[in-house]
């Protein structure tokens, strides 16, 4: 569990420092990398939790708690910073509607943050039914944003 937490903290730190490390890239590319890296980290932590709930991989309470903790830690990263004006162009799946509806997009992200906080809290109980409900609620929060703001294919 400690290794996974350290990995997430290290990755979050690298993500936060990414703008400095890639200052040679144009802003569009830098922000796209920022967003894609962040979302990849979310998926790497949430995906195994979904798989455990669905019975696709063995239930491992210790790992599940670590994934939930790390997912909650990632909610402290300023994801919305990755969407400045002008960064909607290029190779991305972020729909232009994000920039047209920034308040709604921010509200949906706040809903995700709340869902993840609740998931993290419930994960520690070991109650599989409650965990399954919170995983579903977190998935619904992800889907609410994806349905409206994520393109199926890359936009150019």
Where are these regions (language model features)?
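Sequence context surrounding c-type heme c attachment/ligation sites in exported
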Residues: 25, 29-61, 65-156
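Bacterial N-terminal signal peptides that target proteins for export
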Residues: 1-10
